[in-house]
Amino acid sequence: MGVANDSSPEYQWMSPHRLSDTVILGDCLYFNNIMSQLDLHQNWAPSVRLLNYFKNFNKETLLKIEENDYINSSFFQQKDKRFYPINDDFYHISTGGYGIVFKIDNYVVKFVFEATKLYSPMETTAEFTVPKFLYNNLKGDEKKLIVCAWAMGLNYKLTFLHTLYKRVLHMLLLLIQTMDGQELSLRYSSKVFLKAFNERKDSIKFVKLLSHFYPAVINSNINVINYFNRMFHFFEHEKRTNYEYERGNIIIFPLALYSADKVDTELAIKLGFKSLVQYIKFIFLQMALLYIKIYELPCCDNFLHADLKPDNILLFDSNEPIIIHLKDKKFVFNERIKSALNDFDFSQVAGIINKKIKNNFKVKHNWYYDFHFFVHTLLKTYPEIEKDIEFSTALEEFIMCTKTDCDKYRLKVSILHPISFLEKFIMRDIFSDWINGGN
C-alpha cells in the first residue's frame, strides 16, 4: 500500500486506505477507534410497536418514575450547569446546514450527508485535504491557526442517523402526549412539538423520564437530546423533503475549547484579554495573518474559505508564544489561547478545485470575498465593536457595499483587492498590542 504525499494538491485524488466502497484519509487508528464505538447498522422495531409500548403508561405511572431518585445528568442540555457526561457516549453538540456534530471524549465527530448524484466521494474531500495541504506547506507559526482533521471516512452509509432521529422524535412525541393525557399518535405539528419540547427540556422531572425511556426505547450510545431542536430543523426542513439520507462522510477533529462566537465580555476577561473588543481584534488579526501567509505561497493566491465567520473559528489552548513574521515586523501572541480556522467544506486552494464552490460562484473572488463576509458577521455577532470608534470605522472599509452587490453579507460582484490591502490594514496602531510584541 502506497503512502500519499499530503503536501501535494493531488493528495485529494489519492486513496491511501480502502474499505470496499469506502475510503479513509488520514490516521486509520483514530478513525477505526471511533468507528468501533458506533453501530452503523442499528435498527429498531416498527414505530407502531413503540406506540403500543407507550400504551402501557399513563400520567400516574409517569409520576412514579419522576419520584425516583435516579437521574442521568447527560440528558440535561449541555449549556445547563446540571449537565454531566456520565457515560462514554456520543453527545450531539451541533447541527448546521451541512453537518451533524458529536463530541466523544476529546474528539469531535462530524457526519456530512453528501449529494452523491452531484459529486463523487473523492470530490467531497476539501474539508480534509485543503487544511492538510495548507498546514504542510506553511512554514511558520501561522500553520498553528488551522484546524486539521485527524481522519476522514468517505462514502459511508449514514442512514442510521436519520433512523435514530426518527426513533427519538417518536419517543418524545409519545412521551409528551402521555404526560399531557392526550391520545397517542405519531402525527405531529412542527410548531406544536417544538413548543412542547422546549418548555420541558430543562425540567428535572422531564430529564428523569428521559433517563428511564431513552435507554429502554433508544438503547444507543448516541445521545441526541442535546440541541435536539437543531436536529429537528435539519431533518424537517422543506428543502430536504425528498432527500435521501443514504451516504456521506465521517470526519474526526480535535476538540476545541469554544467556537469564537461563544466568547462574551466575561469569558474574554477570563481568557486574559483587557476587553471583548481586544479579543475581537485578536481573532481578526490572527485570521488576517493566516490569509496573508497563504497568499505568499506559490500558486495559492486563489485561496477561498467561502464561509469565514466567528462560529467557524475555534479556540484552542496555546502553550507557547505564536510569532509570525511579515516584512520587517513580527507579530507576537502571548495569549494562552489561539484561534484556528475550521470547516473547509467549501474551500479551494492551488490545484484543489472544489466543485461545490465552483458551481455556486458566478464571478471570480479572492480573499476580499471572505473578509467582506467576516466583517459583516463580526459586527452582527458583536455590536460592542461600535464602542471602539477607531476599530469600527476601520472595519467599515471592508463593507462598502450596497444591496445590488451584496446579498446576506455575501458579495455578488467581483472585487479583487490585492492582498497588500490586508497587509497594510494590520500594520495600523489598532493592532499595536501584538506588533513587535507590543513594543
From Swiss-Prot:
Q: Which UniProt keywords apply?
A: ATP-binding, Host endoplasmic reticulum, Kinase, Late protein, Nucleotide-binding, Phosphoprotein, Serine/threonine-protein kinase, Transferase
Top EC group: transferase
Q: Which residues form the active site?
A: 307
What does it catalyze? L-seryl-[protein] + ATP = O-phospho-L-seryl-[protein] + ADP + H(+); L-threonyl-[protein] + ATP = O-phospho-L-threonyl-[protein] + ADP + H(+)
Regions that span the bilayer: none
Protein kinase domain segment(s): 87-439
Subcellular location field? Host endoplasmic reticulum; Host endoplasmic reticulum-Golgi intermediate compartment
Q: How is it modified after translation?
A: Phosphorylated in vivo. Autophosphorylated in vitro.
The protein's induction, as recorded, is:
Expressed in the late phase of the viral replicative cycle.
Q: Which domain of life is it from?
A: Viruses
What family does this chain come from, according to its entry? Belongs to the protein kinase superfamily. Ser/Thr protein kinase family. Poxviruses subfamily.
| The name this protein goes by in its record | Serine/threonine-protein kinase 2
Q: Which organism is it from?
A: Vaccinia virus (strain Ankara)
What does UniProt list as this organism's lineage?
A: Viruses, Varidnaviria, Bamfordvirae, Nucleocytoviricota, Pokkesviricetes
